[in-house]
Curated annotation (Swiss-Prot):
Active site: S59
Compartments, record wording: Cytoplasm
Native organism: Shigella sonnei (strain Ss046)
Main location: cytoplasm
Biological process (GO), any one: protein modification process
GO CC terms: cytoplasm
EC assignment: 2.1.1.77
Protein name (database record): Protein-L-isoaspartate O-methyltransferase
Stored InterPro entries: PCMT, SAM-dependent_MTases_sf
Amino acid sequence: MVSRRVQALLEQLRAQGIQDEQVLNALAAVPREKFVDEAFEQKAWDNIALPIGQGQTISQPYMVARMTELLELTPQSRVLEIGTGSGYQTAILAHLVQHVCSVERIKGLQWQARRRLKNLDLHNVSTRHGDGWQGWQARAPFDAIIVTAAPPEIPTALMTQLDEGGILVLPVGEEHQYLKRVRRRGGEFIIDTVEAVRFVPLVKGELA
């Protein structure tokens, strides 16, 4: 039984065009308040982005749902997330597929996310401290790659780590950003522009 606040958010997401009920069920199952600081717990189920420290944010539920829906996941999908952040998007993915790989460049955020996921008994996630621009070559290829920060252009390494038929969803741009979906098909990459967005930048390198 979902709470009134959760139900209200789900209805809002449906009104915004989210149609995949499995994605909506995953959002309902993951307690977003566990991924934000106590000061923001009362706003956890509002459809807004919230700060998580280190200059990073937890994306608004609409954007989490939209990007996840665009990945066209099945339980068997091999998924890579670039930018673990709070671990919220990771948890949504973990409810939808058998295993998630996630890369985070800020070690403090990586450890916090791992603790949150463990506390929620989500053990089907592998996290790595590293440069998201480089993906996770040792675990490639992937059926789906999601990037939760915006590079100025699509990283080549991520495109090459897509399997045939795989989908990459990411925001791209600097001052003006657009959500892009890249599909690998027959050795080519088909790129679609979805909508205008605003994300923190995807920074190269890693932080201790």
